[in-house]
């Protein structure tokens, strides 16, 4: 049996472009893709913190170092420039992989600069 687990997350990215007439997808700065371990053409989920929209698309490589987050095609209706988004990818893991699985978490700050990275989400307290 396989379990779907969080593989990677870009937390609080800022949308820099929303291009309706582009072929589709989400262009992400290549450095951020590599750091998170998200592959080009990999399915991603995007959660817009500003409006609550959640949608699925795929990642394409943006210019390295540009800090680009471009929501393209029909998905451009779901997010606006300046919106904070959480970009996640998930993968299927076999039972024997679960004990050692650690997601790649990349936390971003203003200008989509890297704040820090982690492999565990902090425990939430009541």
From Swiss-Prot:
Protein location: Cytoplasm
GO cellular component: cytosol
Reactions listed under catalytic activity: L-aspartate + H(+) = beta-alanine + CO2
Gene3D superfamilies, alphabetized: 2.40.40.20
Pathway(s) of this molecule: Cofactor biosynthesis; (R)-pantothenate biosynthesis; beta-alanine from L-aspartate: step 1/1
UniProt binding sites for substrate: 57, 73-75
MF annotations from Gene Ontology: aspartate 1-decarboxylase activity
Keyword Cytoplasm among record annotations: yes
Cofactor binding annotation: Binds 1 pyruvoyl group covalently per subunit.
Disulfide bonds: none
GO biological process: alanine biosynthetic process; pantothenate biosynthetic process
Cofactor: pyruvate
Keyword vocabulary terms for this entry: Autocatalytic cleavage, Cytoplasm, Decarboxylase, Lyase, Pantothenate biosynthesis, Pyruvate, Schiff base, Zymogen
Modification Pyruvic acid (Ser) occurs at: 25
Pfam entry (one): Asp_decarbox
Documented EC number(s): 4.1.1.11
Record function comment: Catalyzes the pyruvoyl-dependent decarboxylation of aspartate to produce beta-alanine.
Similarity section: Belongs to the PanD family.
Oligomer status and interactors: Heterooctamer of four alpha and four beta subunits.
Protein name: Aspartate 1-decarboxylase
UniProt organism field: Chromohalobacter salexigens (strain ATCC BAA-138 / DSM 3043 / CIP 106854 / NCIMB 13768 / 1H11)
């Amino acid at each position: 049996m396989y379990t779907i687990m969080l593989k990677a997350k870009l937390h609080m990215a800022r949308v820099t472009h929303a291009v309706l007439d582009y072929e589709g997808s989400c262009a992400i700065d290549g450095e951020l893709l590599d750091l998170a371990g998200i592959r080009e053409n990999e399915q991603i989920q995007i959660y817009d913190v500003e409006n609550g929209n959640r949608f699925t698309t795929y990642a394409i490589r943006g210019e390295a170092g540009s800090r680009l987050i471009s929501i393209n095609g029909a998905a451009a209706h779901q997010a606006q420039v300046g919106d904070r988004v959480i970009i996640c990818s998930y993968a299927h893991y076999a039972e024997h992989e679960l004990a050692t699985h650690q997601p790649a978490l990349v936390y971003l700050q203003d200008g989509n600069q890297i704040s820090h990275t982690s492999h565990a989400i902090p425990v939430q307290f009541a």
